[in-house]
């Protein structure tokens, strides 16, 4: 492939990576990962509410990795509330999983920025055939994509398996018990998914630029070595 086309492809991949890094930085600080509705089970059972009457006992919340806000309703009007995970909810949430989500998000940002620099270096510089070259680009794209995947899996497990929304809604609520009715992932979560997809796409762009996948290259080299051994 002509060098000019390689420059264009690597520049595109670099721009995609930079956009991903900015997106993840923004997503990390916004309370737009999950939007949930919660039912005040205690109040609904007391008055035997059903149908449209349940709307009086339905609250909602949205939150991210550090803070969030919502409204509790238990038949006596809306009660707005705000919360932060650190230090307010440390005793209520699975801390190890939550910290790992933040940690892998930070690693994803760093690796994506490094990947951006590597793509631009390959576009305009004279890269070595080791980590600065295609091998490094493949490696960074794979690790970054894996980090993005881990962030989504860990956060989804925290929300669905450990019932994060219920724990937040019931935090310091001694009288009423809240039950999650619905949850949906919002903007910030899908930014991580988009970033995961972009790293997969960048791997295809590297291949499109004319560089073999690492495992394909090693397989060809192994075949050559076997042929050389047979000759002797």
UniProtKB/Swiss-Prot annotation:
Tell me which InterPro entries the record gives: Clarin (IPR026748)
GO biological process terms held by the UniProt record: actin filament organization; auditory receptor cell stereocilium organization; cell motility; equilibrioception; photoreceptor cell maintenance; positive regulation of lamellipodium assembly; sensory perception of light stimulus; sensory perception of sound
Give the membrane topology: Multi-pass membrane protein
Q: How is this protein annotated for GO cellular component?
A: basal part of cell; lamellipodium; microtubule cytoskeleton; microvillus; plasma membrane; stereocilium; trans-Golgi network transport vesicle
Q: Which residues are glycosylated?
A: 48
Q: Which residues cross the membrane?
A: 8-28, 101-121, 135-155, 186-206
- What is the annotated localization of this protein? Cell membrane
* Main subcellular location: membrane
**In the UniProt annotation, what is the result of changing residue 31 to L?**
In RP61; the mutant protein is retained in the endoplasmic reticulum
The protein's role, per its UniProt record? May have a role in the excitatory ribbon synapse junctions between hair cells and cochlear ganglion cells and presumably also in analogous synapses within the retina.
Family per similarity comment: Belongs to the clarin family.
From the Swiss-Prot or TrEMBL record, give the protein name: Clarin-1
Organism encoding this protein: Homo sapiens
């Amino acid at each position: 492939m002509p060098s000019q086309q390689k420059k264009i492809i690597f520049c595109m991949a670099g721009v995609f990576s930079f956009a991903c890094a900015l997106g993840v930085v923004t997503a990390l600080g916004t309370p737009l990962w999950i939007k949930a509705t919660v039912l005040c089970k205690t109040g609904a059972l007391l008055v035997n509410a059903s149908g449209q009457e349940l709307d009086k006992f339905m609250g909602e919340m949205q939150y991210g990795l550090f803070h969030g806000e919502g409204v509790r309703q238990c038949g006596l009007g809306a009660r707005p509330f705000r919360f932060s995970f650190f230090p307010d909810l440390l005793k209520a949430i699975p801390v190890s999983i939550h910290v790992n989500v933040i940690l892998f998000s930070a690693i994803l940002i760093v690796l994506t920025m490094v990947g951006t620099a590597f793509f631009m270096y390959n576009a305009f510089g004279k890269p070595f055939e080791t980590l600065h070259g295609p091998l490094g680009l493949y490696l960074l794209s794979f690790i970054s994509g894996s980090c993005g995947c881990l962030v989504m899996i860990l956060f989804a497990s925290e929300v669905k398996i450990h019932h994060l929304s219920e724990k937040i809604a019931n935090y310091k609520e001694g009288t009423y018990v809240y039950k999650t009715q619905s949850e949906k992932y919002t903007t910030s979560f899908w930014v991580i998914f988009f970033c995961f997809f972009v790293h997969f796409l960048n791997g295809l762009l590297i291949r499109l630029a004319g560089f073999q996948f690492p495992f394909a290259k090693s397989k060809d080299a192994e075949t050559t070595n076997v042929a050389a051994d047979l000759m002797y």
